[in-house]
Regions:
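Bacterial N-terminal signal peptides that target proteins for export
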Residues: 2-15
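Bacterial N-terminal signal peptides
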Residues: 14-25
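Compositionally biased alpha-helical segments
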Residues: 30-137
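Feature captures outer-membrane beta-barrel proteins of Gram-negative bacteria and organelles
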Residues: 134-155, 163-176, 183, 198-215, ...
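Structural signature of outer-membrane beta-barrel domains
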Residues: 155-157, 188-190, 220-222, 254-256, ...
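Short, conserved beta-strand edge motifs with alternating hydrophobic and charged residues
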Residues: 213-218, 248-250
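Short, glycine/charged-rich beta-strand-loop motifs at protein surfaces that mediate ligand recognition
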Residues: 248-255, 263
Length: 298
């Protein structure tokens, strides 16, 4: 396949990034399997995922194990016995029982499509992914209430010194079962330019794993121009339509100008992988812009 055109180069770069991320997170998963292993865990709140050699996935806990046999108790209370040699891997997953089955937690719930929510991934958790096929990104939990994320553009045809990179720390100030509040910074440096831009923000998220609302106010700034007189409002929401699909909307509003950028789409959820497909448009017209993101969590 030729990689001479910008689109082909973008696809080639994206495929390379996918391969690197998959290999990296695969090694993390392997370490997790060796750590958790085939054993009974003391913490009864932990959910284990057992994947058998035939591809079957079971969610629950290993209740008993010996040299050849495993007794597994599912989240629904069903006890299943199988041979130890039939197990492909075991790992700890986050989520909960709902409607009689296990719903994995959304590993990307610290953001909507691009905008942050007031949630944080937690110590030892994080993600790596790609926005719009050309912006590799990462996010890592720091302690129980902080995280730092960042990334850079890898747009084909643009010199390395002209690419963008960004960093976005976030601190959660309020954390309860149904409401979270946070403050943060989004800082962007356009390559070798001496000027940088960004915004500071504060926001809240209210709801649970089934549905939630996120809202915030941001104050844009430039390193030379200072803070803008017009703040930005972000209003968004998430609704879980099934155990592995979530509807998301993210909308940026400029009150002083009466304009808004609206977006909506879906996120496909696995215990580690999320894939997003959405469209964005402006109230001033200009058609629709497709959004495609994916990330792999640990």
């Amino acid at each position: 396949m030729s990689t001479n055109s910008p689109l082909s180069r973008a696809r080639f770069h994206a495929a390379t990034i996918v391969a690197v991320l998959t290999c990296s997170t695969g090694s993390l998963a392997a370490r997790q399997v060796r750590e958790d292993g085939l054993r009974v865990l003391d913490d009864t709140t932990i959910v284990q995922q057992v994947e058998l050699l035939d591809g079957t996935k079971l969610f629950g806990r290993i209740a008993r194990i010996d040299s050849t046999q495993i007794l597994f108790r599912t989240v629904g209370g069903l006890e299943i016995g199988f041979q130890r040699r039939d197990v492909n891997q075991v790992r700890v997953v986050r989520g909960q029982r709902y409607r009689g089955e296990f719903w994995p937690a959304d590993p990307s719930d610290s953001r909507l499509f691009l905008a942050p929510t007031a949630r944080v991934p937690g110590q030892g958790h994080g993600y790596a992914g790609v926005y719009e096929l050309v912006v590799p990104s990462f996010g890592v939990g720091i302690g129980k209430m902080g995280m730092i994320s960042g990334g850079f553009s890898a747009i084909p045809g643009i010199d390395l010194e002209d690419q963008l990179f960004y960093i976005a720390p976030k601190l959660q100030l309020l954390s309860s079962e149904y409401v979270q509040g946070a403050v943060g910074l989004f800082w962007v440096k356009p390559g070798t330019s001496e000027e940088s831009v960004g915004m500071v923000y504060t926001g809240i998220t209210a709801g649970d794993f089934r549905a939630s609302f996120s809202g915030g106010i941001s104050f844009p700034f430039g390193s030379r121009s200072g803070f803008s007189e017009d703040p930005l409002l972000m209003l968004g929401g998430e609704v879980r339509t099934s155990k592995d699909v979530k509807f998301i909307t993210e909308n940026w509003i400029v009150p002083g100008e009466g304009t808004a950028i609206l977006s909506f789409g879906f996120r496909r959820i696995d215990s580690r992988l999320t894939v997003e497909a959405a469209v964005a448009t402006s109230t001033k017209g200009g058609g629709f812009l497709p959004l495609v993101n994916f990330s792999i969590a640990w």
